[in-house]
Curated annotation (Swiss-Prot):
The chain crosses the membrane at residues 155-175, 181-201, 221-241, 254-274, 291-311, 319-339. One of its GO terms (cellular component) is plasma membrane. This is Uncharacterized protein AF_2058. Disulfide bonds: none annotated. To M.jannaschii MJ1032. It comes from the Archaea. It is a multi-pass membrane protein. It comes from Archaeoglobus fulgidus (strain ATCC 49558 / DSM 4304 / JCM 9628 / NBRC 100126 / VC-16).
Length: 344
C-alpha cells in the first residue's frame, strides 16, 4: 500500500524558537512530545493545535489500516526566502527517507499555506486541512484576542506599521496646513505597501535596511552614499509633486512629475549603486556589474525624460527629432555599459 504523509508546516519555526526542538520531527510519539513542550512554552500558539490535529488524522488513517506517517517541518523566524529554503531542504530529506506517495497538509490557516507550492513540487497533495480554533464570542474574550494578536510581532508588522505610516503621512500634511494633500499621500503609501506585499519585496527591503545598518556600524563609505541616495529620492518626489500639483490635465500632470523628477531619481539610483559597489569592494566581491547598471539607469532616465518632454510639448520645434535622438543616445549609453561589463 502506498505510504501517506500527514505533514505539519511551521513556517516561522515556533517549535525551534519557543520549545528548542529541531526539525523535522517524525513519528507520532515524537510529535506528541513536541506539541506538549510547545504548548507548555506558549499555550496560545496555534501550531500546537495544528500538531494535535495532525495526530488525530494520523490515528484515523492508521485505524483504517493505511500506511501513514506524521511529520512536522519547520522553517525559520526570518519568514520568506530563508524559511522557505529550510522547509524545502527538510522536505527533500523527508521524501527521500520515507518515499511517500501523497500528503495531507495540516495548517493553522496563517502564512504556512504560502509553502503549498513547495510541497506540491515534491509530493502529491491529497488534502489541505485547516485548523481553526474556536473562541468564546464574549466582548471580553474578543478584546483579549485582539490584544494578543497585536502583541504578535508578525501581525503587528502587517497591521500596525501601515496604520502608523498613514497617521504619520496625514499629520505631516496637516502641520503643513494642506490636509487635502494628506489623502493623496495616504493613497500613494497604500499603493506602495500593496505592491510590496503583492510581489513579496518585504525581505528585500529588510535586507537593504540591514545593509545600511551594517555600513553605519562598520563605518563604511557606503553609508554616506545610502544617505545621499535617500535625500535625492525625496527631492525627486518633492520636485515632481510641486511641478504637477496645480495641473488639471492628468496626462500633463503625470508628464510634468516625470520630467522634473527623473534626473533626481537617476542620481538617487546612481548613489545607491555606488553604495552597493563600495560594499562589494569592501567584501572583495565583483563591482563591475554595478557600474554597468549605472549606465543602464542613465539610459533609462534619458528615454523617460525625453518622452515626458515630448508629451508636455509635442508642438515644439524638433520635438520628435529630440525624442529620437534621446532614444539613440540611450541605446549607445546602454551598449557602453554592457560592453564595459564584458571587458571587465
Amino acid at each position: 500500500m502506498p505510504k501517506k504523509l500527514v505533514l505539519v508546516i511551521d513556517r516561522d519555526d515556533d517549535l525551534g524558537q519557543k520549545a528548542g526542538i529541531s526539525s523535522p520531527v517524525i513519528g507520532r510519539d515524537n510529535i506528541v512530545s513536541a506539541a506538549v513542550r510547545l504548548g507548555t512554552a506558549d499555550p496560545e500558539d496555534s501550531d500546537v493545535n495544528a500538531m494535535f490535529a495532525a495526530i488525530k488524522i494520523y490515528d484515523e488513517l492508521k485505524g483504517r489500516g493505511e500506511d501513514v506517517e506524521v511529520v512536522v517541518v519547520c522553517g525559520d523566524r526570518s519568514v520568506g526566502v530563508v524559511s522557505d529554503s529550510k522547509i524545502a531542504e527538510q522536505l527533500d530529506r523527508v521524501v527521500l527517507n520515507l518515499r511517500p506517495s501523497s500528503a495531507i497538509v495540516v495548517t493553522d490557516g496563517s502564512e504556512d499555506e504560502f509553502v503549498l507550492p513547495i510541497i506540491s513540487s515534491r509530493v502529491k497533495i491529497d488534502s489541505v486541512h485547516r485548523v481553526v480554533v474556536r473562541q468564546s464570542r464574549t466582548i471580553e474574550s474578543t478584546y483579549f484576542l485582539i490584544r494578543r494578536m497585536l502583541n504578535d510581532p508578525k501581525i503587528a508588522r502587517i497591521t500596525l506599521a501601515p496604520l502608523g505610516m498613514i497617521f504619520l503621512v496625514y499629520s505631516i500634511f496637516l502641520v503643513m496646513q494642506h490636509p487635502e494633500w494628506g489623502l493623496g499621500g495616504i493613497i500613494f503609501f497604500l499603493g506602495v505597501y500593496f505592491m510590496v506585499k503583492a510581489y513579496g519585496w518585504e525581505q528585500n527591503i529588510a535586507n537593504l535596511l540591514e545593509t545600511v545598518r551594517v555600513s553605519l556600524v562598520e563605518g563604511r563609505l557606503s553609508f554616506i552614499f545610502y544617505v545621499t541616495s535617500a535625500i535625492l529620492l525625496i527631492i525627486s518626489i518633492v520636485n515632481g509633486f510641486n511641478a504637477a500639483v496645480n495641473i488639471a490635465d492628468a496626462a500633463q500632470a503625470i508628464s510634468s512629475f516625470i520630467f522634473y523628477s527623473t534626473w533626481w531619481f537617476v542620481l538617487s539610483g546612481i548613489f545607491a549603486l555606488l553604495a552597493r559597489a563600495a560594499d562589494a569592494y569592501a567584501e572583495k566581491r565583483r563591482v563591475s556589474k554595478y557600474f554597468t547598471i549605472i549606465f543602464l539607469l542613465i539610459a533609462f532616465g534619458l528615454i523617460v525624460w525625453a518622452s515626458a518632454a515630448y508629451v508636455l510639448n509635442p508642438e515644439a520645434p524638433n520635438a520628435l527629432q529630440n525624442l529620437a535622438g534621446a532614444i539613440v543616445g540611450a541605446i549607445l549609453i546602454a551598449a557602453i555599459g554592457v560592453f564595459t561589463l564584458k571587458r571587465l
